[in-house]
Swiss-Prot record:
Family: Belongs to the class-II pyridoxal-phosphate-dependent aminotransferase family.
Lineage, highest ranks first: Eukaryota, Metazoa, Ecdysozoa, Nematoda, Chromadorea
Pathway field: Lipid metabolism; sphingolipid metabolism
EC numbers: 2.3.1.50
Organism: Caenorhabditis elegans
Protein's recorded name: Serine palmitoyltransferase 2
Catalytic reactions of this protein: L-serine + hexadecanoyl-CoA + H(+) = 3-oxosphinganine + CO2 + CoA
Cofactor(s), by name: pyridoxal 5'-phosphate
Secretion signal, residue range per the UniProt entry: none
Function: Component of the serine palmitoyltransferase (SPT) that catalyzes the first committed step in sphingolipid biosynthesis, which is the condensation of an acyl-CoA species and L-serine. The catalytic core is composed of a heterodimer of sptl-1 and sptl-2 or sptl-1 and sptl-3. Required for the specification of abicobasal polarity and development of the gut lumen.
Length: 558
């Protein structure tokens, strides 16, 4: 039977059988409403609160800001490739000149004592480290010596051997911080979070000095897990002391070699590692592309595992809420619809979206007006919006109990430090309004306002910005590898701390400056950053957008 005939048969089967047992979400991507239709209320599980209006700080649920990925012209793309080619050619020349002794450069030579050691990097990785990364190493790995709030103190350092080693004169520089994931501004050295975290040390100390299964977890962590489940509107939750391990070490507990993982193209490294460790078959769909996802789902059901020619026992879709390098928001309603249609499971990583998205900070599930029970595995981290460390997995009690018994990171690792658990508990309570104030709601609203203002101003100034206007992650494309060093150094010289990203973290032609907006930022601070970026963009001719005319006469309010 031909592939086309199989697909047609599958369509008939799905329409006659699966649709009888499942219903498709009413909230769909870019859903249109009739003029005479009354505005519908979207039900969201909020514990004691049953419903919320379909209109919030982001506008109507059915009219969310789309993800934008403006492309550059071919000529600029060719120029970027030529820049990389020139970089590699001169790097090879430098390697040969140094190797044959024409130029003395002891800093990049291997120590004779290390000749018998196993290489840490492949040949290309070592070559790239020696000749490309080392030239701009000074804009990365900058040590900080203060709380990473709206401003942060950077330790000054100088290098006399091409960034191989550093000297520290003992001074520091205070900069506007647009590089940390401090979305809601809870990274503070004073206030209720810091005070209650400090008091928890007196009660419970700094560590339990054991694993969860030997002596158990702290009272603070037990309280936190109950609060996380209440906050998300699910049955249960489990917390871990490391966010990266929450993904990488728990995925193998959910799937095995008889399962299929369908992963978004731009998923985080922790998810990719988890997929590899699980032993499951893995297929990648194009970023946020529902047609690509459905095509893989259809083929997986129609043909099964190509190695065994048997049906997969389980199909798990893995996506993120906000993608940290793209600034885009996942199309959750579309993904849930396909998940239900094809009887798959859904794993949602809300590391960057929990606390930062939604009317009450409950992530992209609330942002889209979806039911949290439609997501099988809700994952998130506490390193961003909560100003702490660690991660969580939430969902049904059966799933969480399975992880408590089978997860290596829960079984062998130490439980969460009590002051960290208390920091998360206090900040989450503020977000939920349990402190009796509106501080949490005001932080969420201020973050949304800051993010929209900053993004729109960059677009108005002629820069290409990826992602959604509602996202606090703002990637500004600069493309050329040399631009990363230029922006990193010039921004620091003007007392602004930002993150520049290039290959291998991104594609070779998509170098970028990534701004992370915070509720702690004032309009004056954002304007100062925008003024500096605009100046550097003019100096380096990195205003590549062809759509700036669409925003020229638009009044952008804060």
């Amino acid at each position: 039977m031909s592939r086309r005939t199989d697909s047609l048969c599958l369509d008939e089967y799905l329409s006659s059988e699966l649709k009888k047992r499942t219903h498709i979400l009413e909230c769909a991507w870019n859903q249109e409403h009739d003029d005479d239709e009354e505005e519908e209320e979207v039900k969201v599980d909020q514990g004691s609160e049953e419903t919320t209006s379909s209109h919030d700080i982001y506008g109507d649920v059915g009219k969310r800001a789309p993800n934008e990925f403006e492309k550059i012209d071919r000529l600029t793309t060719i120029k970027v490739y030529i820049a990389w080619l020139a970089l590699f050619v001169f790097a090879h020349i430098r390697e040969y000149v140094t190797r044959f002794g024409f130029v003395k450069d002891l800093s990049s030579k291997e120590n004779a004592k290390m000749k018998d050691f196993v290489p840490l990097f492949s040949d290309f990785e070592a070559f790239y480290q020696r000749n490309c990364y080392i030239k701009v190493r000074d804009v990365f790995e900058r040590p900080i010596c203060s709380v990473p709030g709206a401003t942060v103190d950077l330790v000054d350092r100088v290098s006399h051997d091409g960034n191989w080693t550093y000297e520290y004169p003992g001074t520091r520089t205070n900069v506007i911080n647009v590089g940390s994931y401090n979305y809601l501004g809870f990274a503070q050295s004073a206030g209720p979070c810091a005070e209650q975290s400090a008091s928890s040390i007196d009660r419970e100390g700094l560590s339990c000095c054991t694993t969860v299964h030997e002596r158990g977890r702290s009272v603070s962590q037990a309280k936190l897990e109950k609060l996380v489940a209440e906050f998300l509107g699910v049955e249960d939750a489990i917390c871990f002391s490391m966010g990266f391990a929450t993904n990488s070490m728990n995925a193998p507990c959910l799937v095995d070699k008889h399962s299929l993982i369908i992963s978004d193209k731009y998923n985080h490294a922790s998810l990719i590692l988890g997929c590899r460790l699980s032993g499951a078959s893995t297929k990648v769909f194009e970023h946020n592309d529902m047609e690509s996802l459905e095509r893989i789902l259809r083929d997986a059901i129609a043909y099964g595992n190509p190695k065994t020619h048997r049906p997969y026992k389980k199909i798990l879709i893995i996506v993120e809420g906000i993608y940290s390098m793209e600034g885009s928001i996942c199309n959750l309603p579309g993904i849930i619809a396909l998940k239900k249609k094809y009887q798959a499971y859904l794993y949602l990583d809300e590391a960057h979206s929990i606390g930062a998205m939604g009317k009450t900070g409950k992530g992209v599930v609330e942002y889209w007006g979806c039911d949290p029970k439609d997501v099988d595995i809700l994952m998130g981290t506490f390193t961003k919006s909560f100003g702490a460390a660690g991660g969580y997995i939430a969902g049904s009690k059966r799933t969480v109990d399975h992880l408590r018994a089978a997860s290596p990171t829960g079984y062998y690792s130490s439980p969460m430090s009590p002051p960290i658990a208390q920091q998360i508990y206090t900040s989450m309570s503020i977000i939920m309004g349990k402190d009796g104030t509106k501080d949490g709601a005001q932080r969420i609203e201020r973050l949304a306002r800051n993010s929209h203002y900053f993004r729109m101003k960059l677009k108005q100034n002629g820069f290409i910005v990826y992602g959604s206007n509602d996202s606090p992650v703002v990637p500004m494309l600069i493309y050329f590898p040399t631009m990363c060093g230029f922006y990193g150094r010039e921004m620091l010289a003007r007392n602004i701390g930002c993150v520049v990203v290039s290959f291998p973290a991104t594609h070779m032609t998509e170098g970028r400056v990534r701004f992370c907006i915070s509720a702690a930022h004032t309009k004056e601070q954002l304007d100062e950053v925008l003024e500096t970026v605009n100046l550097l963009g003019s100096m380096s001719r990195s205003k590549f957008s062809k759509r700036s005319h669409l925003y020229k006469n638009q009044k952008i309010e804060w």
